[in-house]
């Protein structure tokens, strides 16, 4: 939002917490959003240049039945609801950008390189992302609005993203790779998430899935070694995979597995 405002765009933010959001983004117009039902916010998509839909419950927690339902609802159902709002707009938006995830590809062997044409993987997260993207594509199929699905990797950056959680053990000299450290992390810096999102918003040739990752993925061992070097902390203390699974259940796949995703389309666009 801050980058859009900085370049002179007028931005409306739909949120469930108007007061907090307005305080954080004083230059934006902030409107109350109901994530589970139509409301006055439907009118906000009328005539805009683009809608960027980023809603989604955190997946980094144990997947109880309630958690699974909320992960699905907060992604698929809200995307369908946004599509309903776009369908009712008299002047359709120029584009609909919807967050997605590299979880689309499911857990994969580290040597396999996955671009946007790779098929979906298997498992709970992969199934969620497949249906999430179907809901996003329906906006274009039903309403003729250009749709882009942003398959975002592990986001890092100072003061946000996954980095804070990744470095916490290192501060207490407890850092190291998980398991054998061979699982691949398809990461991206927060600034590049913004850059690729703006590229997709502005470039009318961009539609469909877009891998939002750095071109060079890293193994868990490489990530641990890099964090240790920057913080001047040891990075050799391995965390047993069984311990992670005991604490997180099925959700442990987020940490113990990975996929080597390549941003072929972004590279072809010159990013």
Question: Which stretches of residues belong to each language-model region?
Answer:
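NAD(P)H-binding glycine-rich loop region in Rossmannoid oxidoreductase-like domains
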Residues: 19-78
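Mid/C-terminal beta-alpha module of Rossmann-like enzyme folds, strongest
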Residues: 203-250
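Glycine/proline-rich active-site loop of Rossmann-fold NAD(P)-dependent oxidoreductases
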Residues: 145, 156-165, 200-210
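A conserved pocket-lining segment of Rossmann-fold NAD(P)-dependent short-chain dehydrogenase/reductase
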Residues: 165-192, 199
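Glycine-rich "substrate-gating" loop/helix at the edge of Rossmann-like oxidoreductase active sites
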Residues: 119-125, 152-160, 180-190
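Conserved Rossmann-fold NAD(P)-dependent oxidoreductase catalytic core, especially the SDR/UDP-sugar
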Residues: 70, 80-123
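Conserved beta-loop-beta element that borders a ligand/cofactor-binding pocket
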Residues: 100, 134-158
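C-terminal amphipathic/interface module of NAD(P)-dependent oxidoreductases
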Residues: 253-271
